[in-house]
Amino acid sequence: MAVISSIFKSSHNKHLRPFDARRDMNAAADLIEFCFGDSMDPNGKLYLSRMRAAAKDKGLSRWTAMAKGQTSFPLAGFVWEEGGRIVGNLSMVSFFTPGRRIYFFANVSVYPEYRRRGIARALTNAALQKSRQRWAQAVWLQVQDDNLTAVNLYSSLGFEPRARRTTWNVQPKMLQGEAPAGANVTTRKSRHWSQQRTWLEQNYPEEIRWHLSLKIPALRPGLWGMAYYFFNETYIRQWAIQRDNRLLGVLTWQASRYLADRFWLAAPPESENAALESILPFIRREQYLRRPVSLNYPAGRAVESLQKAGFEPKNTLLWMEAKL
């Protein structure tokens, strides 16, 4: 606590203080929207609307109820205030994984006219200090991969790149393409599970899976998997793509409480394009989709097939970690 307190006693950082959900929520939402609105997906826009709804709840009882179990909502962090205006923000979200506690830094944002004054650095330093105080083992954040200024800032503070991921979005009516001859699309079978699980673990590594909505045990065939997604209120459908009796990949559709459902693709680099070019036209023809769908996938992979099918890349993020 003494280390954190010393941050706020510094005259240089007199504008830096902890985020107060009771009075900062609306101003933080405005700042986040200004800085990131153009790159937000439907779920991000829903996130902002919930922040603003919470700002109207003076007691925050409704916000607390919504935030229970939802690790993405900003109930902690730091802001930079000048002249009674919030001009900088950093949200801190706590995650618990087996054997360790992780903090995720989100919504690191500063109004343009206040940039290049060290505000983002001061916010990040304060959050790192608090993470150490809370006995976190690591801190993660995401940054646009082409934002070299931010990447260099975080690198100078001890963050190292861990992954590059692209989020792809598609509206049901925008799906395109015809399936090539020779591909066979079926519901996923129990015999496919071992290979599917291996590919999922490769495409969605454990070190980043904690921040995704992917729970691999929920995709397991049989009663165990059914019980997992039943009690977690998760609805899924899964399809296997084969050619000449060889499994090319497995695609999972997962319903979401947010504005876009999710795809999870289990396929290796050598067959992911063939798998997508077979399964996506099948899904379009059978009209399985009713809502927008989002696919999080390693950057640079399956690009041509996804674009041909009507997907658009929303962003490519560099995932960075600082070990504490």
Where are these regions (language model features)?
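Conserved N-terminal entry element of GNAT/NAT acetyltransferase domains
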Residues: M1-F34, D38, Q171-R191
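Amide-forming acyltransferase catalytic core, primarily the GNAT-like/NAT-type
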Residues: K14, A54-S61, E160-Y258
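Active-site rim helix/loop that mediates acceptor-substrate recognition in acyltransferases
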Residues: I32-E82, I86, W210-I236
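Conserved beta-strand in the GNAT
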Residues: L75-V79, R85-S94, F104, S109, ...
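Conserved acetyl-CoA-binding loop-helix of GNAT-fold acetyltransferases
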Residues: V110, R116-Q129, Q133, A138, ...
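Conserved active-site alpha-helix within GNAT-family acetyltransferase domains
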Residues: R117, R121, D145-A163, P298-N315
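Conserved GNAT acetyl-CoA-binding A-motif
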Residues: S131-Q142, E286-P298
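Conserved catalytic-core motifs of GNAT/GCN5-like acyltransferases
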Residues: Q142, E160-K173, E312-A322
